[in-house]
């Protein structure tokens, strides 16, 4: 879906949530640290969820 094309958003908060996002340049789901607020849809709790939705 289109959420897979959204940019990675860490957000301004300083929590530490290991998440995955779909990197549209590489075509792969990639780990990143999410700050906990003001994110977007390209933010998955598991690699499997990211791959399932973005078909990586």
UniProtKB/Swiss-Prot annotation:
<feature type="disulfide bond">
    <location>
        <begin position="29"/>
        <end position="50"/>
    </location>
</feature>
<dbReference type="GO" id="GO:0042151">
    <property type="term" value="C:nematocyst"/>
</dbReference>
<comment type="function">
    <text>This protease inhibitor shows two different activities, it inhibits both the capsaicin receptor TRPV1 and serine proteases. It partially blocks the capsaicin- and acid-induced response of TRPV1, a receptor of the pain pathway. It also weakly inhibits trypsin and chymotrypsin activity (Ki=0.5 uM and Ki=7 uM, respectively). In addition, it may also alter tachykinin levels by suppressing endogenous proteases. In vivo, it shows antinociceptive and analgesic activities. It significantly prolongs paw withdrawal latency and blocks heat-induced and chemical-induced acute pain.</text>
</comment>
<keyword id="KW-1015">Disulfide bond</keyword>
<protein>
    <recommendedName>
        <fullName>TauPI-stichotoxin-Hcr2d</fullName>
    </recommendedName>
</protein>
<feature type="site" description="Reactive bond for trypsin">
    <location>
        <begin position="14"/>
        <end position="15"/>
    </location>
</feature>
<dbReference type="GO" id="GO:0099106">
    <property type="term" value="F:ion channel regulator activity"/>
</dbReference>
<keyword id="KW-0872">Ion channel impairing toxin</keyword>
<keyword id="KW-0722">Serine protease inhibitor</keyword>
<feature type="disulfide bond">
    <location>
        <begin position="13"/>
        <end position="37"/>
    </location>
</feature>
<comment type="similarity">
    <text>Belongs to the venom Kunitz-type family. Sea anemone type 2 potassium channel toxin subfamily.</text>
</comment>
<keyword id="KW-0166">Nematocyst</keyword>
<dbReference type="InterPro" id="IPR020901">
    <property type="entry name" value="Prtase_inh_Kunz-CS"/>
</dbReference>
<feature type="disulfide bond">
    <location>
        <begin position="4"/>
        <end position="54"/>
    </location>
</feature>
<keyword id="KW-0528">Neurotoxin</keyword>
<keyword id="KW-0964">Secreted</keyword>
<feature type="domain" description="BPTI/Kunitz inhibitor">
    <location>
        <begin position="4"/>
        <end position="54"/>
    </location>
</feature>
<dbReference type="Pfam" id="PF00014">
    <property type="entry name" value="Kunitz_BPTI"/>
</dbReference>
<dbReference type="InterPro" id="IPR002223">
    <property type="entry name" value="Kunitz_BPTI"/>
</dbReference>
<keyword id="KW-0646">Protease inhibitor</keyword>
<dbReference type="InterPro" id="IPR036880">
    <property type="entry name" value="Kunitz_BPTI_sf"/>
</dbReference>
<dbReference type="GO" id="GO:0090729">
    <property type="term" value="F:toxin activity"/>
</dbReference>
<dbReference type="InterPro" id="IPR050098">
    <property type="entry name" value="TFPI/VKTCI-like"/>
</dbReference>
<keyword id="KW-0800">Toxin</keyword>
<dbReference type="GO" id="GO:0004867">
    <property type="term" value="F:serine-type endopeptidase inhibitor activity"/>
</dbReference>
<dbReference type="GO" id="GO:0005615">
    <property type="term" value="C:extracellular space"/>
</dbReference>
């Amino acid at each position: 879906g289109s959420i897979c094309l959204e940019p990675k958003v860490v957000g301004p908060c300083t929590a530490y949530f290991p998440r995955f996002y779909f990197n549209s340049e590489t075509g792969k789901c990639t780990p990143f640290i999410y700050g906990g607020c003001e994110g977007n849809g390209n933010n998955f709790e598991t690699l499997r969820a990211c791959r399932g939705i973005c078909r990586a």
